[in-house]
């Protein structure tokens, strides 16, 4: 190999972090915010929908489950597709799918139609999450990657806050259909903007297109006001065929199984609580307006959780941050269950929200770093798929929380234990990825 050639990571270090990555983070982040709105809208609208259509507890659980079934299929399909034909197709298509079907949901004539449309909305959302993380991670220098991947997750909190705020303003005055319609508009706008982002240069290089990869890197350098050295990119030999079964091959099996455990448990705990949160408050005797006010307060607590995790993943490392935040999530979920007044429920809920969403951010930072380029999208898609399985289970399990009003100790204890199991899994991860370059092949890990 020519001694004057440079690796992809050396090239990324040369172009640096600047306007291009900031623009990409905002574009990815706004898509994430739009997706967060779509995922949690039904939980915010559920009391109003149930009242209008007279839904049973089982029907409410099915409606909450629908989007996660779509997200499971979407995560597996789009994650795999992004490793085969590139990140760009899924990056653009997924946000269009979830926004179009999200808008159509506002016009659902019946319960069955609403379930079907929310499932299709989930198919788009399920692809956006893993594809966005893969493409953004592949544009980042190693020393900034963890912090900015967690900050990207902060946009999810902005979406939750926006959804809670819109529900507070719209549902009591105009009804749930207007909430669904208004919330779909941002995604349609973001779809148009996303088309200008080029394909991942790392993907291009791994797939034998060094000229195209260099052209993209030169674009990044010009945007950032830097210069790419006049040296050829060192080819990356793909020695690991892309395929889901490769995630369980020796060298990756332990990491994959532990990551799947964490994704499953954090999703079960998070959606088990938050899908039903407005309904929990309603069951305590709150009127509709205070329900949305308290939900909005808990949503606000997510932002500082993300920002603290963004700092600690670089200061402490990915693994200890994950373990601490997941364990703390479990502790405060139990205290949330044991609280005997609305004020204490809200106070413990704030800390639960803080730590849970910080854990999400750290997990999204670690997972794409755990896999080589040829498997990164597939790995993210498979891991994300486990959240869709537990997310689909959580609403039905959460239906039990409505029995007996605020007597929520047993089911919420299950969710608390789920978080703690995830924290234990984090301690078993074999690799710390802080400040390390992304691997392109399994042999390079």
Give the residues covered by each predicted segment.
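Transmembrane-helix signature of 12-pass secondary carriers
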Residues: 1-445
């Amino acid at each position: 190999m020519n001694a004057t050639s440079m690796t992809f990571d050396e090239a990324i270090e040369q172009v640096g972090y600047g306007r291009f990555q900031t623009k990409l983070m905002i574009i990815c982040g706004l898509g994430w915010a739009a997706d967060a709105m779509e995922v949690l809208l039904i939980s915010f609208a559920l009391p109003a929908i149930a009242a209008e259509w007279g839904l049973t507890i089982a029907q409410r659980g099915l409606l909450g489950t629908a989007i996660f079934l779509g997200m499971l299929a979407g995560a597996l399909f789009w994650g795999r597709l992004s490793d085969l034909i590139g990140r760009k197709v899924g990056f653009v298509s997924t946000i269009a799918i979830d926004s179009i079907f999200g808008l159509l949901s506002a016009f659902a004539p019946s319960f069955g139609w609403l379930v079907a449309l929310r499932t299709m909305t989930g198919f788009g959302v399920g692809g956006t999450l893993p594809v966005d993380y893969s493409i953004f991670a592949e544009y980042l220098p190693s020393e900034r990657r963890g912090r900015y991947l967690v900050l990207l997750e902060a946009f999810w909190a902005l979406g939750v806050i926006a959804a809670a705020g819109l529900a507070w303003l719209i549902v009591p005055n105009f009804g749930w259909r207007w909430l669904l319609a208004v919330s779909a508009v941002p995604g349609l706008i973001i779809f148009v903007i996303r088309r200008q982002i080029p394909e991942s240069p790392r993907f291009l290089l791994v797939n034998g297109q060094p000229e195209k990869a260099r052209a993209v890197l030169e674009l990044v350098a010009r945007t950032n006001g830097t210069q790419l050295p006049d040296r050829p990119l060192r080819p990356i030999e793909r020695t690991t065929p892309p395929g889901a079964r490769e995630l369980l091959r020796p060298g990756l099996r332990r990491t994959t199984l532990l990551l799947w455990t964490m994704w499953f448990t954090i999703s079960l705990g998070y959606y088990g609580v938050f899908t039903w949160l407005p309904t929990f408050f309603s069951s305590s005797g709150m009127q509709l307006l205070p329900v949305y006010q308290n939900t909005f307060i808990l949503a606000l607590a997510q932002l500082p959780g993300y920002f603290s995790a963004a700092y600690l993943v670089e200061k402490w490392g990915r693994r200890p941050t994950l373990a601490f935040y997941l364990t703390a999530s479990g502790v405060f979920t139990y205290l949330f269950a044991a609280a005997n007044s609305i004020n204490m429920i809200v106070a413990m809920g704030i800390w639960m929200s803080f730590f849970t969403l910080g854990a999400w951010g750290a997990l999204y930072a670690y997972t794409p770093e755990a896999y080589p380029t040829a498997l990164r999208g597939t790995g993210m898609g498979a891991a994300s798929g486990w959240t869709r399985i537990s997310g689909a289970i959580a609403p039905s399990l959460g239906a039990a929380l409505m029995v007996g009003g605020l007597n929520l100790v047993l089911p919420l204890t299950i969710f608390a234990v789920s978080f703690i199991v995830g924290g234990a899994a984090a301690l078993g991860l074999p690799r710390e990825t802080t400040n390390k370059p992304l691997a392109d092949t399994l042999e390079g890990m």
